[in-house]
Amino acid sequence: MKHELTDVQAGLRKGRGTRDQIANICWIIEKPREFHKNIYFCFIDYAKAFDCVDHNKLWKILQEMEIPDHLTCLLRNLYAGPEAMVRTGHGTTDWFQIGKGVRQGCILSPCLFNLYAEYIMRNARLDEAQAGIKIAGRNVNNLRYTDDTTLMAESEELKSLLMRMKEESEKVDLKCNVQKTKIMASGPITPWQIDGETM
């Protein structure tokens, strides 16, 4: 799996952690000050990220990423047939099938989510975008730690990155929580409207 994830994803990677991404962001904030440039960050929050992973879409994503069929088959068997019912003040509901969400507490769940998120980023084609920050000759426009995603750019082109990612996320049933998604800018920024909400 490590070959499937880009180096901007630090979640569940040996020798890497949240402090690495925090250090990267701090370094990125300091650098533009030297050159008197503005920098814009968008800290994205997915609404119920792990609960919204659609199983059927996940299997297709794993197939597209060429995860070996025998591993996908094992995962399908692990997720086959889960049912639940809800107890209310008026009794219990009928049993119903669960077709979404990765298993809470399962060691595989963050890995599966990482692959789901990687699929979103690839389809959003952020690696091809001009918006971003030049670091050692390389354009960097996102840093990730499992479900925590930070987009960055030197201009308000950041909005185009966010809209690309939001569009691709919604195709696989992940919704950007606009109320919890935050923008940070070192310079002036005009307020954005996304889904009728001002960011």
Model regions and ranges:
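Nucleotidyl polymerases of mobile genetic elements and RNA viruses
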Residues: 1-199
